Amino acid sequence: MARVKRGVTAHAKHKKVYKLAKGYRGRRKNTIRTAKAAVDKAGQYAFRDRKRKKRTFRALWIQRLNAAVRPFGMTYSVFINGLSKSGIVVDRKVLSDLAINEPAAFQAIAEKAKAALAA
């Protein structure tokens, strides 16, 4: 069997890790052992935060809706209850966007929700 020299393969693998570690501070960008650990940890954070992002944005939309319905004399939970009773099926992301960009349309929805609660 012929001898296999691994220099080219090792260099390619290291290059791949260094490319991912570009922009890191200190030895984390140019020492293979620390760069590999840093890149692995970054991947763990990225995986975790892709899940967390969904929760964070939903919480943001809820906070925006709570602030938007307060002038109409309602809280967020009362508003959502009114929406379900009135049969309006719009998700929180769209409602939040309406509250910011289309206040008149959001006001109409809020009034319908309030009317459904009164009935």
Swiss-Prot record:
The keyword Nucleus does not apply. It comes from Rhodopseudomonas palustris (strain TIE-1). GO terms for biological process: ribosomal large subunit assembly; translation. Transmembrane segments: none annotated. HAMAP family: Ribosomal_bL20 (MF_00382). This is Large ribosomal subunit protein bL20. Binds directly to 23S ribosomal RNA and is necessary for the in vitro assembly process of the 50S ribosomal subunit. It is not involved in the protein synthesizing functions of that subunit. CDD domains: Ribosomal_L20. PROSITE patterns: RIBOSOMAL_L20 (PS00937). NCBIfam families: rplT_bact. Keywords: Ribonucleoprotein, Ribosomal protein, RNA-binding, rRNA-binding. It holds the Pfam family Ribosomal_L20. One of its GO terms (cellular component) is ribosome. GO terms for molecular function: rRNA binding; structural constituent of ribosome. Belongs to the bacterial ribosomal protein bL20 family. It comes from the Bacteria.
